[in-house]
């Protein structure tokens, strides 16, 4: 008889503890209902990238001296530099320059080590296509400057995530670790 009463008491204590945990979760849910949404409605609102953002690479054909430093410092030897040697002036003349952004890891080494600064990083990050071969940019496509997010009339820009009510989110004050069962 005592075993049955002890079992019933243990069961009721576990049920009450489970109800408390469910109640704590519900309090957290209610606490978040008063906050502004944290998501950005992407196609209509765009986040302005920082100045150091590493987006698509911009290339200036006239500045390039075909030294191939960008190929040597690239961890995956990605830029393809085609050149021919002009015998009359004994200099390399650039014929073609291309980068495949389907393979590029956007490390920025090519931009950093370029001696003539013909490469630069833009703030363009929308590189999605249905065919991966469209991501192989030649010198003409690399030379086009993208439309700035601030100048795009179809979108609303968000300068950062500082529109949240409390700034950086912190844990719930009543949160406990779930180590005791």
From Swiss-Prot:
The keyword Plastid is assigned to this record: yes
Bilayer disposition of the protein: Peripheral membrane protein
EC identifiers of the protein: 7.1.1.-
Keyword annotations: 4Fe-4S, Chloroplast, Iron, Iron-sulfur, Membrane, Metal-binding, NAD, NADP, Plastid, Plastoquinone, Quinone, Repeat, Thylakoid, Translocase
Localization in the cell: Plastid, Chloroplast thylakoid membrane
Pfam families: Fer4_7 (PF12838)
Binding residue positions for [4Fe-4S] cluster 1: 64, 67, 70, 114
Origin: domain of life: Eukaryota
UniProt cross-references to Gene3D superfamilies, sorted A to Z: 3.30.70.3270
Protein name per its UniProtKB record: NAD(P)H-quinone oxidoreductase subunit I, chloroplastic
Top-level EC class as recorded in UniProt: translocase
Record domain 4Fe-4S ferredoxin-type: where: 55-84, 95-124
The gene coding this protein: ndhI
Family indicated by similarity: Belongs to the complex I 23 kDa subunit family.
GO cellular component: chloroplast thylakoid membrane
Residues noted as binding [4Fe-4S] cluster 2 in the record, renumbered to the chain: 74, 104, 107, 110
Assembly and binders: NDH is composed of at least 16 different subunits, 5 of which are encoded in the nucleus.
Reaction(s) catalysed (UniProt annotation): a plastoquinone + NADH + (n+1) H(+)(in) = a plastoquinol + NAD(+) + n H(+)(out); a plastoquinone + NADPH + (n+1) H(+)(in) = a plastoquinol + NADP(+) + n H(+)(out)
Protein function: NDH shuttles electrons from NAD(P)H:plastoquinone, via FMN and iron-sulfur (Fe-S) centers, to quinones in the photosynthetic chain and possibly in a chloroplast respiratory chain. The immediate electron acceptor for the enzyme in this species is believed to be plastoquinone. Couples the redox reaction to proton translocation, and thus conserves the redox energy in a proton gradient.
Cofactor(s) required for function per UniProt: [4Fe-4S] cluster
BP terms from Gene Ontology: photosynthesis, light reaction
Alphabetized NCBIfam families for the sequence: ndhI, NuoI, PRK05888.1-3
Cofactor note: Binds 2 [4Fe-4S] clusters per subunit.
Taxonomy of the source species: Eukaryota, Viridiplantae, Streptophyta, Embryophyta, Tracheophyta
Protein source organism: Angiopteris evecta
Principal location: plastid
């Amino acid at each position: 008889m005592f075993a049955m009463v002890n079992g019933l008491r243990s069961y009721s204590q576990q049920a009450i503890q489970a109800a408390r945990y469910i109640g704590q979760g519900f309090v957290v849910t209610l606490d978040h209902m008063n906050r502004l949404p944290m998501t950005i409605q992407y196609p209509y609102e765009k986040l302005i990238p920082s100045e150091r953002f590493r987006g698509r690479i911009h290339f200036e054909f006239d500045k390039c001296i075909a030294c191939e430093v960008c190929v040597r410092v690239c961890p995956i030897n990605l830029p393809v530099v085609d050149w021919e040697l002009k015998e009359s002036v004994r200099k390399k003349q650039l014929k073609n320059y291309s980068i495949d952004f389907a393979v590029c890891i956007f490390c920025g080494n090519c931009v950093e080590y370029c001696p003539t600064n013909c490469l630069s990083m833009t703030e363009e990050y929308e590189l999605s296509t249905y065919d991966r071969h469209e991501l192989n940019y030649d010198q003409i496509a690399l030379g086009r400057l993208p439309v700035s997010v601030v100048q795009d009339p179809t979108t609303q820009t968000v300068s950062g995530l500082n529109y949240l009510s409390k700034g950086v989110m912190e844990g719930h004050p009543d949160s406990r670790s779930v180590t005791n069962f």
